[in-house]
Amino acid sequence: QKFVSERGGGFLMLGGMESFHEGKYLRTPIGDMLPVYLDLDEETAEPPGKVQFQLAREGWLQPWARLRDTESDERARLDGMPAFEVFNRVRALKPGASVIASVRDEKGGELPALAVQRFGRGRTAALMVGDIWRWGMKDAAAHDDMDRAWRQLVRWLISDVPLRVQTSAEPVPADANGAERVQVRVRDEKFQPVDDAVVTIEIEPVVFAGTAGAAGA
């Protein structure tokens, strides 16, 4: 949990018989990180049968969740995905989380399939489909699509990972000389703040070459 919340790492839970509610992750540090609630009774947790994967509204707005340039091509790709048979139900989405993809069961019901959220300095995701590998087994093109989808999801998960040494500069208010205030944040191996860090900053002048005719402009 600290790896995600303090280090800025990413965490993804995949569906399966030992995941989510079925894996007894309720009231555990891992369960607390997930973007979904796991408290279900056994009747509610029953698998929904075969389900069809589709993008939710938020998924259509996120470039990393899409694999095609146009909506029509993306819908055609989604329609060509196989039905999935292993699915973990969840009770609800946690506040601040987003549903990127959903599934539709044989009765027309819609259930969250891919949910994401920020958790401290990091990000977490939950993919409730347990046999997503079926997608890549369809043909070579589908396998390439699945590989690309994994890459894009992982990039999203780790896109905010901070460096151990970070610098920022901002103008000093009401300073006629254009002074800048430079801040340096240093963290140790466990990504805890270092209060007595010794930092050396080297500043070099930048010379801008003039363009021809600039003097007479």
Q: What are the language-model segments listed below?
A:
Residues Q1-A217:
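N-linked glycosylation sequons
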